[in-house]
């Protein structure tokens, strides 16, 4: 045999599969079955229905995923009314939450929210007191040359509004003025189509009343809108930019929007007869700051809104008399502030007595005259002073007011036989407290609101940085300073001389905090105002077009409103909140369908469920 053939045979035998040995001769790494601890065998076959018999069971109870009931008074964000009730029931050992308990805790919940506002006021002021928008609103210090005074342009703007209102009053324009009742309000879809034509709406719709429509036209006349004004732009910068334009009558700013990157809206009001095209060219391109240039547009007012209903208690005889006194005081306050004639209240009352149309109505209440007079007084404050009486909020212009309440208010008839609810009493009490903050600030319990008088606040801060170490050893603890002195009076002199910047900052915080808590409609942290967890998430996200959480969709009240919470949640979230009663046809858009995404007009197929 050749040598090559022999090598191939060896290679073949190397990879050739040999026959397995006998079972008794096979080698195994495991010991034989007879020597093992147990005899291995196949488990018996089980029937189809008993395969759970020999399975091990979970030990112990299943874990619960409910959130713990934390004390709301220890948190810096608001909790919902339902969660507050559950915590209250647990703390007071109430076994079940009944409907009576649900309706009786409005006062307790309102006290909790007032305490929350007081606890978070100082931290909010300290974080925003150095911003321009906050300084313009609350920092009043004559030693620093900061005095809040009304400009001559604004006085002339108010005088023009006053003259227009009085001319209409003398011409009989307000002789039949009356707020719509709840029966007059026509229900419309909450989110109407954008293609809806206002001209096809019913003529008796309160939104299209002559007073409301004329108010809209007056607000948008000779006005341009500048959106997204940054918070670091001060009123002085706007004055320097616009005062040099001869045909600019007045400008106004909206309240700051803490959801939309602290942005504001600016409205520029021009004198009558101004060419708006030329005015737009003159205003556009003006640089207010290094990072902001004016780009104006036509003003906008929200549409498709309902009048906000006022609580029934406002129409009772005693409440109406008290509100009339407050209305007259607010009218006198506006006359003094804007240098207007002080006979407005008397002229309105005389006109209503002599020329008001009195329709025959059997259901007319006994205080019908007082109700109409109070409504006309409130309309005067709304049109001239741009002051919303029912929310105690002051605006800089009429168009700024219409952004929050474009359709005004509606009244409910008071039923003497009906018991006044706790929610209405709370609303009236809060309204009177807001009036006191504006009319009698010296009589307000400022400590309960989270502030102190300016001098007391400064003294408390000085005492907190003066540490007594021995009988004649007092140390300064301002920042990194650690100097020793013989007495506290020497430490105070040292702080006045060496730490003047720190002392000026403390004084600024004290002044701003005092004015901030006395403002009934002050801007607050959204997590303090809103109980929606969605709002807590979007605070750390850039603005992507969310609706303003602070907008008033129902009558503003400090008590709980389930509808208001749902609207806040749906407004702050980009996804619609789920409702169990919602029909399937409205939720169809959330389900995936096998339609052509390139065909936007393709209809959703009808599926047989």
UniProtKB/Swiss-Prot annotation:
Annotated C2H2-type zinc fingers sit at: 474-499
Q: Which residues carry this modification: Phosphoserine?
A: 28, 30
Its BP terms in the Gene Ontology are: nuclear polyadenylation-dependent CUT catabolic process; regulatory ncRNA-mediated gene silencing; regulatory ncRNA-mediated heterochromatin formation
Gene Ontology MF annotations? lncRNA binding; zinc ion binding
Q: Does the keyword Acetylation apply?
A: no
Compositionally biased residues, Low complexity: 27-36
Source organism, top-level taxon: Eukaryota
Does the keyword field hold Phosphoprotein?
yes
The family note in this entry says: Belongs to the ARS2 family.
What is the protein's given name?
Answer: NURS complex subunit pir2
Q: Which organism is it from?
A: Schizosaccharomyces pombe (strain 972 / ATCC 24843) (Fission yeast)
Q: What does UniProt list as this organism's lineage?
A: Eukaryota, Fungi, Dikarya, Ascomycota, Taphrinomycotina
